[in-house]
Amino acid sequence: MSQSLIVALDFPGKQDVEQFLRHFEGEELFVKVGMELFYKEGPAIITYLKEKGHKIFLDLKLHDIPNTVKSAMRSLASLDVDMVNVHAAGGSSMMKAAIEGLEEGKQEGKERPICIAVTQLTSTSEAMMKKEIGIEKTLEEAVAHYAKLTKESGLDGVVCSTLEVPKLREVCGNEFVTVTPGIRLASDDVNDQVRVATPKRARELGSSYIVVGRSITKAENPLEAYKTVKQQWEGVTV
């Protein structure tokens, strides 16, 4: 599970990122850059992190018409990021266009970034999905439907809750990538996410990657928290 622990850099700007990364001198991380940080700092934050030797999941959740998504992905691939995502609700044509854009934009001699789709946000409960989004399926059925569509569209995997991983293994196979946010240490608050799990539980359920934010970034000692999460996730002492 080398570098399958992704640290969410949910910070408002580069200064906060620099301060956080001082705890990890010499450590090559797999980090997630989301909307807040990317919209504030732009592509320069990607360049900065790459120069530090980190892998990057650029979490922008694209959802637009196919041609727009294709063009956007072409641009994102040129930044040499390692993972990107879209909303599965955008449909098959949009997801196929995303892959086309990534192939066209990837740097020479390198593989295209891993491309995954969001099924349902981990802040979404089944009651909310039915009442507000208008999907009458169970949450598990809706996620499985989107995951199957994602695989058929040529993407590498999905973002999903750990609770949905076993079902997705049945539907999409063991090679299908599952990236699971909503990971907390047992002692942490769950905050605004509904479907959460510990690193150990994510490992037991078969997640490919876990995304951990506050448990590490808000810790008194981020490096020690990182090591604790990594130990629980990988099942070994680090």
Curated annotation (Swiss-Prot):
<feature type="binding site">
    <location>
        <position position="10"/>
    </location>
    <ligand>
        <name>substrate</name>
    </ligand>
</feature>
<keyword id="KW-0665">Pyrimidine biosynthesis</keyword>
<dbReference type="GO" id="GO:0044205">
    <property type="term" value="P:'de novo' UMP biosynthetic process"/>
</dbReference>
<feature type="binding site">
    <location>
        <position position="193"/>
    </location>
    <ligand>
        <name>substrate</name>
    </ligand>
</feature>
<dbReference type="InterPro" id="IPR011060">
    <property type="entry name" value="RibuloseP-bd_barrel"/>
</dbReference>
<dbReference type="GO" id="GO:0005829">
    <property type="term" value="C:cytosol"/>
</dbReference>
<feature type="binding site">
    <location>
        <position position="32"/>
    </location>
    <ligand>
        <name>substrate</name>
    </ligand>
</feature>
<dbReference type="InterPro" id="IPR013785">
    <property type="entry name" value="Aldolase_TIM"/>
</dbReference>
<dbReference type="InterPro" id="IPR014732">
    <property type="entry name" value="OMPdecase"/>
</dbReference>
<keyword id="KW-0456">Lyase</keyword>
<dbReference type="GO" id="GO:0006207">
    <property type="term" value="P:'de novo' pyrimidine nucleobase biosynthetic process"/>
</dbReference>
<dbReference type="Pfam" id="PF00215">
    <property type="entry name" value="OMPdecase"/>
</dbReference>
<comment type="similarity">
    <text>Belongs to the OMP decarboxylase family. Type 1 subfamily.</text>
</comment>
<comment type="pathway">
    <text>Pyrimidine metabolism; UMP biosynthesis via de novo pathway; UMP from orotate: step 2/2.</text>
</comment>
<feature type="binding site">
    <location>
        <position position="184"/>
    </location>
    <ligand>
        <name>substrate</name>
    </ligand>
</feature>
<comment type="subunit">
    <text>Homodimer.</text>
</comment>
<feature type="active site" description="Proton donor">
    <location>
        <position position="61"/>
    </location>
</feature>
<feature type="binding site">
    <location>
        <position position="213"/>
    </location>
    <ligand>
        <name>substrate</name>
    </ligand>
</feature>
<feature type="binding site">
    <location>
        <position position="214"/>
    </location>
    <ligand>
        <name>substrate</name>
    </ligand>
</feature>
<dbReference type="GO" id="GO:0004590">
    <property type="term" value="F:orotidine-5'-phosphate decarboxylase activity"/>
</dbReference>
<dbReference type="InterPro" id="IPR018089">
    <property type="entry name" value="OMPdecase_AS"/>
</dbReference>
<comment type="function">
    <text>Catalyzes the decarboxylation of orotidine 5'-monophosphate (OMP) to uridine 5'-monophosphate (UMP).</text>
</comment>
<dbReference type="InterPro" id="IPR047596">
    <property type="entry name" value="OMPdecase_bac"/>
</dbReference>
<keyword id="KW-0210">Decarboxylase</keyword>
<dbReference type="InterPro" id="IPR001754">
    <property type="entry name" value="OMPdeCOase_dom"/>
</dbReference>
<feature type="binding site">
    <location>
        <position position="122"/>
    </location>
    <ligand>
        <name>substrate</name>
    </ligand>
</feature>
<protein>
    <recommendedName>
        <fullName>Orotidine 5'-phosphate decarboxylase</fullName>
        <ecNumber>4.1.1.23</ecNumber>
    </recommendedName>
</protein>
<feature type="binding site">
    <location>
        <begin position="59"/>
        <end position="68"/>
    </location>
    <ligand>
        <name>substrate</name>
    </ligand>
</feature>
